[in-house]
Amino acid sequence: MSRRNVAKKREVSADRKYNSKIVAKFINHVMKKGKRALAEKIVYGAMEKAEKQLGVPAMDVLTGVLANISPAVELRSFRAGGVNYRIPVPIKEERSRFIAFGWLLSEARKRKGMCSRDRIALELLEAHSGHGGAFRKFEENVKVAESGRAFSHFRFFNTGGARRSNPSNNIGGNR
């Protein structure tokens, strides 16, 4: 890790077809091994298929999906008293979108017997209507966050690691 400068956040340029940064981020998420043209073909095809089936513009489909499955909190593990707690921590919109894209693609990739375009389109349709694998993950996240809400005060503690005394002060070998 560099000690000098904090890495600057690079702006993502909007995609060609919908002129949207959200679609560009989704394409980047789908892309494997730098094959952007293939990822664009898959995403645009999936969005067009979802648009035809729902009769709603493709951008509205994607924004509706993100509204349905984007989490408001992230679960972070915290160890206290020998027990691991999963504590809900509020997150920014960009991180929320990133998690939603991950859920959407992981559930789409679990489907077998179809091409990627059809799998993503089907997952988009189901997430838009409020069911499907990605929506299930969202609901599970909400339930776990609700159950961990009692321990949410732990997020204000320093979780940077164990506290150790200075070893030079340990005269006589007391640990």
Swiss-Prot record:
Entry keyword Ribonucleoprotein: yes
UniProtKB keywords: Ribonucleoprotein, Ribosomal protein, RNA-binding, rRNA-binding, tRNA-binding
Pfam families hit by this protein: Ribosomal_S7 (PF00177)
Purpose: One of the primary rRNA binding proteins, it binds directly to 16S rRNA where it nucleates assembly of the head domain of the 30S subunit. Is located at the subunit interface close to the decoding center, probably blocks exit of the E-site tRNA.
GO biological process, one term: translation
Quaternary state and interactors: Part of the 30S ribosomal subunit. Contacts proteins S9 and S11.
Family: Belongs to the universal ribosomal protein uS7 family.
Covalent S-S links between cysteines: none
GO CC terms in record: small ribosomal subunit
Protein name: Small ribosomal subunit protein uS7
Molecular functions (GO terms): rRNA binding; structural constituent of ribosome; tRNA binding
InterPro entries, A to Z: Ribosomal_uS7, Ribosomal_uS7_bac/org-type, Ribosomal_uS7_CS, Ribosomal_uS7_dom, Ribosomal_uS7_dom_sf
NCBIfam families, alphabetized: rpsG_bact
